[in-house]
Design a protein with these regions (language model features):
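Hydrophobic faces of well-ordered beta-strands that scaffold small-molecule active sites
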Residues: 96-101, 125-127, 161-163, 180-182, ...
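Active-site-adjacent beta->alpha loops and helix N-cap segments on the catalytic face
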Residues: 74-79, 135-148, 169, 184-200, ...
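Non-catalytic terminal accessory/regulatory regions of metabolic enzymes
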Residues: 1-97
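Alpha-helix-loop-beta-strand connector modules within alpha/beta enzyme cores
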Residues: 139-163, 195-202, 251-265, 311-334
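Catalytic alpha/beta core domains of metabolic enzymes, predominantly
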Residues: 199-298
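Active-site mouth loops of central-metabolism enzymes
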Residues: 95-112, 136-140, 160-164, 183-185, ...
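Glycine-rich, proline-tolerant flexible connector loops at the mouths of alpha/beta enzymes
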Residues: 126-144, 300-310
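Catalytic beta/alpha-barrel core
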Residues: 6, 142, 158-169, 178-191, ...
Length: 337
């Protein structure tokens, strides 16, 4: 339930109402918006008389939320959330580009790639140290040593880093990682979601291969319900009947998520197509669709990559793409003036 307050609502009256509702066992989530302030109620509100609350002089209206996700709901939080990742803002008009190798392999590889990404305009360095692979015989990542190399690249470039955590036991190694990534396969690993929800660290939540929008937002709700509301959604392609591409990038998710939720949404065109030649058009489509950022795989030598080389861009290709992304972003801003 959402209680929308009038602009002239007295603090004493609002505090009294909050106290009465909390005494009944409800968790109150106050939100101060640019247009109005609200009190979000979490709990079983079936017994509450909405008309009685609405009759209070300082209450504008009462709205019951039908969707199962509350904290991730746009109705619960009308203004766009802005997430701070090591000084880089995402959402609310702030656009971020996460770029780097699928997996960390050598000091030279990650540092060379990181420097090239920063020079081209990337704002966050991505890199995998723990890799969830379809085959148990494939390269599984360097583990803690890979995270140390990412930290080294961070010191060299100043770029904050995002890396995937696959299991609760791995969290002990992520103290110096600026943003935790929950991969598509772990989107409904509820134990892991709850654990990262207890941390004061931004989380990048990738959509599951066959997840609906509601299932995706409910996964975000698991994180937020534990206290961590620093969540960024990432669409990375879903499984459809099409076989020409690895996955199908759901561009519709951008406006739909902006309508349903206040959380930022970024797009991962690299994993969606699985082919480097598709990254450019899918990236531009994502920018045009209103995405809050991009996540792009870049490798200094894709032909020698130990993981997903065919979908990685070379530094020169990424540089060319970033010029187009920046130009398109500027054009869109001009169109809205």
């Amino acid at each position: 339930m959402i209680i929308t307050l009038k602009q002239n609502a007295a603090a004493e009256e609002v505090s009294r109402l909050r106290g009465e509702l909390e005494a009944q066992g409800f968790v109150i989530h106050p939100v101060e918006g640019t247009r109005y302030n609200i009190l979000g109620l979490i709990g079983d509100t079936a017994s509450l008389d909405a008309r009685q609350i609405e009759s209070l002089d300082f209450v504008d209206k009462v709205t019951r939320i039908q969707e199962p996700y509350k904290k991730a709901n746009r109705k619960f939080h009308p203004d766009d959330s802005v997430i701070n990742v090591g000084g880089v803002l995402i959402g609310g008009g702030h656009f971020a580009v996460m770029a780097g190798p699928c997996s960390v392999e050598t000091p030279e590889q990650v540092i060379e790639t990181a420097k090239a990404c920063k020079e081209a305009g990337a704002t966050i360095l991505r890199g995998g140290a723990f890799k969830p692979r379809t085959s148990p015989y494939s390269f599984q990542g360097m583990g803690p040593e890979g995270l140390e190399l990412l930290e080294l690249a961070k010191k060299e470039t100043g770029l904050p880093i995002v890396s995937e955590v696959m299991d609760i036991s791995q969290l002990q190694y992520f103290d110096n990682v600026d943003m935790l990534q929950i991969g598509a396969r772990n989107m409904q690993n509820f134990t892991l979601l709850k654990e990262v929800g207890k941390l004061n660290k931004p989380v990048l939540l990738k959509r599951g291969l066959s997840a609906t929008y509601e299932e995706w937002l409910m996964a975000a709700e698991y994180i937020m319900s534990e206290g961590n509301e620093q969540v960024v959604l990432c669409e990375r392609g879903i499984r459809t009947f099409e076989t020409k591409t690895r996955n199908t990038l759901d561009v519709t998710a951008i406006p739909m998520m902006h309508e349903l939720s206040h959380l930022p949404i970024i797009m991962d065109p690299s994993h969606a197509a699985g082919m480097s030649r598709m990254v450019r058009p899918l990236s531009l489509a994502s920018v045009g669709g209103g995405a809050d950022g991009l996540m792009i795989e870049v490798h200094n030598d894709p032909s020698k990559a130990l993981c997903d080389g065919p979908q990685a861009l070379r530094p020169d290709q990424f540089t060319s793409l970033m010029k187009e992304v920046i130009a398109l972003r500027q054009a869109l801003v001009e169109c809205t003036k």
